[in-house]
Amino acid sequence: MSVIHPLQNLLTSRDGSLVFAIIKNCILSFKYQSPNHWEFAGKWSDDFDKIQESRNTTAKEQQGQSSENENENKKLKSNKGDSIKRTAAKVPSPGLGAPPIYSYIRNLRLTSDESRLIACADSDKSLLVFDVDKTSKNVLKLRKRFCFSKRPNAISIAEDDTTVIIADKFGDVYSIDINSIPEEKFTQEPILGHVSMLTDVHLIKDSDGHQFIITSDRDEHIKISHYPQCFIVDKWLFGHKHFVSSICCGKDYLLLSAGGDDKIFAWDWKTGKNLSTFDYSSLIKPYLNDQHLAPPRFQNENNDIIEFAVSKIIKSKNLPFVAFFVEATKCIIILEMSEKQKGDLALKQIITFPYNVISLSAHNDEFQVTLDNKESSGVQKNFAKFIEYNLNENSFVVNNEKSNEFDSAIIQSVQGDSNLVTKKEEIYPLYNVSSLRKHGEHYS
């Protein structure tokens, strides 16, 4: 049975008039017009072919060695004295049983003037720069593609809207001027690094205008470095026992971090002080399932070791609330930040959904989630939910009308697309955060 591939992420423009959605290797654009009317505004697909790129690389190498090979061929003879001619090297290609190749699109960000959209593509480990034209039939136009040696994992855009900070899978951080011309071969040196995979990055400044880069990694570290003098480490924030998957920054130097621990950490990143921790383990317990059982080789005799991790933590822009979700669960947890005691966190609300949450994002004072709705019966729905703050009720509520109309817009936009309408077994892996957890084998 074929289904529409679940949405992997959402990004909304400042005024809410544009929404970008990631499905597999595509970015879909939608215009939102009140009341609750959606209009499809184009699609961009990453058609980069890894196998073809491998062929091109091999061809260049062969061409460079052709003259040398011709000379050597004259000297090669068989046992009968016949000349032996070298054969061209085989082009590497996936063989039988090779793992599938997934061309994820990640890390959607808009520049502050919203004239450009920045994203990352796994296909060629690149940073994508799009022009955004709201008057065009297809609002996105790919302008540049900066390729890296390792996969970009997280990005942050500087206030000048031209500098992008990229953290990669290898542990290095780079600074790219998106107005520059992309190099054919990546030669840039990193501006700072970790000895572990980077998971998040933020470029921020203090009240004196000094800039800092905050990075988190798989080795439970949070590092604060001066920018652009990144060789100067300002401080480390120690306290996590497991990997850090997500960080977010608030006013007055507040930093929130989460990951493989069963706690949310609140910090004053300027002083390095751990302000508080919020233990959410009892709150999430009713939502855990078989997907949270530890891998068999790390289980006990009773097979009851549970492992879970926060996939994303994000702050409301104007309200004192922060939301997060645990991977492979059907809820988001909203916390209230104390206005009297900096860093104090208290439970505000838990919102449940019919399917597992895949992604969490924020637009002003609205939270948005995408759901793993591949098991939806009948007409597929529940692709995403838009969650608004109701001042009268002093609580967050799902805007069902807006969400339902968005479902209809998604269905109409992908009709006849054999790439986005796929078999269930061909859906991209949607739960990757838990793989960051280290076990005994990583320390041996």
Swiss-Prot record:
WD repeats: 1-47, 48-99, 100-147, 148-192, 193-237, 238-279, 308-354
SMART domains: WD40
Biased composition (Basic and acidic residues): 71-85
PTM sites of type Phosphoserine: 93
Keyword Phosphoprotein: yes
Known pathway: tRNA modification; N(7)-methylguanine-tRNA biosynthesis
Places the protein is found: Nucleus
A cellular component annotation (GO) from this entry: nucleus
Region (Disordered): 55-92
Protein family per UniProt: Belongs to the WD repeat TRM82 family.
Function field: Required for the formation of N(7)-methylguanine at position 46 (m7G46) in tRNA, a modification required to maintain stability of tRNAs; its absence resulting in tRNA decay. In the complex, it is required to stabilize and induce conformational changes of the catalytic subunit.
Cited PANTHER family: TRNA (GUANINE-N(7)-)-METHYLTRANSFERASE NON-CATALYTIC SUBUNIT WDR4, WD40 REPEAT PROTEIN 4
Protein name: tRNA (guanine-N(7)-)-methyltransferase non-catalytic subunit TRM82
